[in-house]
């Protein structure tokens, strides 16, 4: 999610009026959701089947991978571009375009693919499920993605706390080497490709691509200034693409079933299937693969068993992980779960980690806790983030008690705007957006709490 820079500053294209004529063009899809089982890419999401090589092959992994590799980088990039796949780590940048930055004449330096498995966003656990239950999808995805970029090797940077997941991944890599699927002459294609696992040490900031690269190199995980971008100077000073686990893992299936198949799901510019995490006040917290642009209400009601106490008991939802602004129940009624629809709703898809809060939630305290997290995880390199997030944390602690004045709400908003967009990476943005969402939708609750505190304070003084 640290890659999700300036999402709220984006704009949607103007609405286009459609005229129906007598041609045979199929009408645009208007309803989304209810993904069929045969269209699911992640078929072992809940670990009900064997995750090792034989089990993975029985579910279609490593099928005709040699043919995909032999078709070459241009063909793979063409299918990924046709699919409309956008980065699944939060930023939503077109994957085919990003990968094509690496597909240029070599200057003698090796190229690398780095997979960001440092999943530290509160509420997010989709990549963990892929690595734990479907590790071969990721390993095969590294090979296919690496071939598209002309990469020599892939480094999978995995969160240090994911001990069991790292173990499963290492087993899957060993099995792939022993079967000749990766390494020298991978899959018999004549293409050499290695895969390495690098364990992180728990720093959230290493989810930012350049901080992750610094960590791989053995340095302190602090974001780099850009340019130069990783595609020019990345890990070990070589051209590098950093990609999310889910983004990489879906690429072999896109190549096998065709980019047009993947593009048939979701709205235009928001195509494909997506893993959604649903947690919080729901009857059945889960991770589920669903079509992009599925209505948020349907996602919660159908897959998570609904809000505890019923839909009318819903207070607010954080739709894309802790760094995206919350939206109230009134917006949740109709909003679609895709990049553009959520930007229009003044929030973002982020990592698609849906955090549901019912009416029992102290919404001010919940957001204050998130700000405390970002204050703790700031690397301290940028002054607006280091000082501003610490200041916001102190103010939010007083807002929880109500020990503040209404004018301070505007001050907090202004500080959040001064942090947003003024830092090297997007951690400052991720800390500012939850505060902005709270003020935008729950300002009356903040003012009421301050009023109650003032009345109680006056009553105590009168008692003396």
Curated annotation (Swiss-Prot):
<dbReference type="InterPro" id="IPR019575">
    <property type="entry name" value="Nuop51_4Fe4S-bd"/>
</dbReference>
<dbReference type="Pfam" id="PF22461">
    <property type="entry name" value="SLBB_2"/>
</dbReference>
<keyword id="KW-0007">Acetylation</keyword>
<keyword id="KW-0411">Iron-sulfur</keyword>
<feature type="modified residue" description="N6-succinyllysine; alternate">
    <location>
        <position position="81"/>
    </location>
</feature>
<feature type="binding site">
    <location>
        <begin position="199"/>
        <end position="247"/>
    </location>
    <ligand>
        <name>FMN</name>
    </ligand>
</feature>
<feature type="modified residue" description="N6-acetyllysine; alternate">
    <location>
        <position position="81"/>
    </location>
</feature>
<keyword id="KW-1278">Translocase</keyword>
<dbReference type="GO" id="GO:0051287">
    <property type="term" value="F:NAD binding"/>
</dbReference>
<keyword id="KW-0520">NAD</keyword>
<keyword id="KW-0496">Mitochondrion</keyword>
<feature type="modified residue" description="Omega-N-methylarginine">
    <location>
        <position position="257"/>
    </location>
</feature>
<dbReference type="GO" id="GO:0045271">
    <property type="term" value="C:respiratory chain complex I"/>
</dbReference>
<keyword id="KW-0472">Membrane</keyword>
<dbReference type="InterPro" id="IPR054765">
    <property type="entry name" value="SLBB_dom"/>
</dbReference>
<feature type="binding site">
    <location>
        <position position="425"/>
    </location>
    <ligand>
        <name>[4Fe-4S] cluster</name>
    </ligand>
</feature>
<dbReference type="GO" id="GO:0051539">
    <property type="term" value="F:4 iron, 4 sulfur cluster binding"/>
</dbReference>
<feature type="binding site">
    <location>
        <position position="385"/>
    </location>
    <ligand>
        <name>[4Fe-4S] cluster</name>
    </ligand>
</feature>
<keyword id="KW-0004">4Fe-4S</keyword>
<feature type="binding site">
    <location>
        <begin position="87"/>
        <end position="96"/>
    </location>
    <ligand>
        <name>NADH</name>
    </ligand>
</feature>
<dbReference type="GO" id="GO:0008137">
    <property type="term" value="F:NADH dehydrogenase (ubiquinone) activity"/>
</dbReference>
<feature type="modified residue" description="N6-acetyllysine">
    <location>
        <position position="375"/>
    </location>
</feature>
<comment type="similarity">
    <text>Belongs to the complex I 51 kDa subunit family.</text>
</comment>
<keyword id="KW-0809">Transit peptide</keyword>
<keyword id="KW-0999">Mitochondrion inner membrane</keyword>
<dbReference type="Pfam" id="PF10589">
    <property type="entry name" value="NADH_4Fe-4S"/>
</dbReference>
<keyword id="KW-0560">Oxidoreductase</keyword>
<dbReference type="InterPro" id="IPR011538">
    <property type="entry name" value="Nuo51_FMN-bd"/>
</dbReference>
<dbReference type="InterPro" id="IPR050837">
    <property type="entry name" value="ComplexI_51kDa_subunit"/>
</dbReference>
<feature type="binding site">
    <location>
        <position position="379"/>
    </location>
    <ligand>
        <name>[4Fe-4S] cluster</name>
    </ligand>
</feature>
<dbReference type="GO" id="GO:0010181">
    <property type="term" value="F:FMN binding"/>
</dbReference>
<feature type="transit peptide" description="Mitochondrion">
    <location>
        <begin position="1"/>
        <end position="20"/>
    </location>
</feature>
<dbReference type="Pfam" id="PF01512">
    <property type="entry name" value="Complex1_51K"/>
</dbReference>
<keyword id="KW-0830">Ubiquinone</keyword>
<feature type="modified residue" description="N6-acetyllysine">
    <location>
        <position position="104"/>
    </location>
</feature>
<keyword id="KW-0488">Methylation</keyword>
<keyword id="KW-0288">FMN</keyword>
<keyword id="KW-0813">Transport</keyword>
<keyword id="KW-0249">Electron transport</keyword>
<dbReference type="GO" id="GO:0005743">
    <property type="term" value="C:mitochondrial inner membrane"/>
</dbReference>
<dbReference type="GO" id="GO:0006120">
    <property type="term" value="P:mitochondrial electron transport, NADH to ubiquinone"/>
</dbReference>
<protein>
    <recommendedName>
        <fullName>NADH dehydrogenase [ubiquinone] flavoprotein 1, mitochondrial</fullName>
        <ecNumber>7.1.1.2</ecNumber>
    </recommendedName>
</protein>
């Amino acid at each position: 999610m640290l890659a999700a820079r300036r999402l709220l500053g984006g704009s949607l294209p103007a609405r286009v009026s459609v005229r129906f004529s007598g041609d045979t063009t199929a009408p645009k899809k208007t309803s989304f959701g209810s993904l069929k089982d045969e269209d699911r890419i992640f078929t072992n999401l809940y670990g009900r089947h064997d995750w090792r090589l034989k089990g993975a092959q029985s579910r279609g992994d490593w099928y005709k991978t040699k043919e995909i590799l032999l078709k070459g980088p241009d063909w793979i990039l063409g299918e990924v571009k046709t699919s409309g796949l956008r980065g699944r780590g939060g930023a939503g940048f077109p994957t085919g375009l990003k990968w094509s930055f690496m597909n240029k004449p070599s200057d003698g330096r090796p190229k690398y693919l780095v997979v960001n498995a440092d999943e530290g966003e509160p509420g997010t656990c989709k990549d963990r499920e892929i690595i734990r239950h479907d590790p071969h999808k990721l390993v095969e995805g590294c090979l296919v993605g690496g071939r598209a970029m002309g990469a020599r090797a892939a480094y999978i940077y995995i969160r240090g706390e994911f001990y069991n997941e790292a173990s499963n991944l290492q087993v899957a890599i060993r099995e792939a080497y022993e079967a000749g699927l990766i390494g020298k002459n991978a899959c018999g294609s004549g293409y050499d490709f290695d895969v390495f696992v690098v364990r992180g040490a728990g720093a959230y900031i290493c989810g930012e691509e350049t901080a992750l690269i610094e960590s791989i190199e053995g340095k302190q995980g602090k974001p780099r200034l850009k340019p130069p971008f990783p595609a020019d100077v990345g890990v070990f000073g070589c051209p590098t693409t950093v990609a999310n686990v889910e983004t990489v893992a879906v690429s072999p299936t896109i190549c096998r079933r065709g980019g047009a198949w993947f593009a048939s799901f979701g709205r235009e510019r928001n195509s494909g299937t997506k893993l959604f995490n649903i947690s919080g006040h729901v009857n059945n917290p889960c991770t589920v693969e669903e079509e992009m642009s599925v209505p948020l209400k349907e996602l919660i009601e159908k897959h998570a068993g609904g809000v505890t106490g019923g839909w009318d008991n819903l207070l607010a939802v954080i739709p894309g992980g802790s760094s995206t602004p919350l939206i109230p129940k009134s917006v949740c009624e109709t909003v679609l779960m895709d990049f553009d629809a959520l930007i229009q709703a003044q929030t973002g898809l982020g990592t698609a980690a849906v955090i549901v809060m019912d009416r029992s939630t102290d919404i001010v305290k919940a957001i204050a806790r998130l700000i405390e997290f970002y204050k703790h995880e700031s690397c301290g390199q940028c002054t607006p983030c280091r000082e501003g997030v610490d200041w916001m944390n102190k103010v939010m602690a007083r807002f929880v008690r109500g020990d503040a004045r209404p004018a301070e709400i505007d001050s907090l908003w202004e500080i959040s705007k001064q942090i947003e967009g003024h830092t090297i990476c997007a951690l400052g943005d991720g800390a500012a957006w939850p505060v902005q969402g709270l003020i935008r939708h729950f300002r009356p609750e903040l003012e009421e709490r301050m009023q109650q505190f003032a009345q109680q304070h006056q009553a105590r003084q009168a008692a003396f």
